[in-house]
Amino acid sequence: MQELIACVDHLRFDLELAVEQQLGAQPLPFPGMDKSGAAVCEFFLKSACGKGGMCPFRHISGEKTVVCKHWLRGLCKKGDQCEFLHEYDMTKMPECYFYSKFGECSNKECPFLHIDPESKIKDCPWYDRGFCKHGPLCRHRHTRRVICVNYLVGFCIEGPNCKFMHPRFELPMGTAEQPPLPQQTQNQQKQNNNQVLQRSSSLIQLTSQNSPVSQQRSPQTIGVMQLQSGTQGNRGPRPLDQVTCYKCGEKGHYANRCTKGHLAFLSGQ
């Protein structure tokens, strides 16, 4: 009723013009000062601010959706050039690392966001289309919906506001590849192992056929090599007569069985 009787929308006060044009705003004494409590510069949003770093108002470029964690501690040195938000807003705080990593946070007054992991899962575009080959092993969400009968016939008057599902018939493009199924990975590993074994066996056959040294070896040399390998494999501990204790310098016992002290070698000198 007041707007009909005495409308003042067409009136402009001098104070409003002064605030919009930033009249009387003095430049900063030196650049880089903290301007977290100042208003946003209207001329900078229009790319018409000529004060630069000496402007007493904040220069915000673009939409900053996350609060600067260094600014919360008073350690951010970028000022207006920081790509994060210099404003304490609970809805734009960074995500809590402990809650996202372990599913719980012991800090009752944690200032960071606790986001439910299930809310991060995206809907599977293949399942929404009709079929997903990964089934329950798919990393995306499979949500059961009722298909709109009118949309299947050809037209639905509700459009995007319809409570039923309007399936998409085009192939989803640009989606991340799904991890392979466990059976597929096992089959691939078996195939790779078989290929490696075949290659190694073929190489052994080629070397045995082409090496002249193996053909020139006599059975006597082969027998000597077998005896040497057998003696090395069955080699037992040395006799005590050949053992020298490094503590006392005497023969006949090991150092761990020596009854003398660790300075016994000095008495021998």
Swiss-Prot record:
This is Cleavage and polyadenylation specificity factor subunit 4. Belongs to the CPSF4/YTH1 family. A zinc finger (C3H1-type) spans 35-61, 62-89, 90-117, 118-145, 146-169. PANTHER family: CLEAVAGE AND POLYADENYLATION SPECIFICITY FACTOR SUBUNIT 4 (PTHR23102:SF26), CLEAVAGE AND POLYADENYLATION SPECIFICITY FACTOR SUBUNIT 4-RELATED (PTHR23102). Residues 173-197 are annotated as: Disordered. The keyword DNA-binding does not apply. GO terms for biological process: mRNA processing.
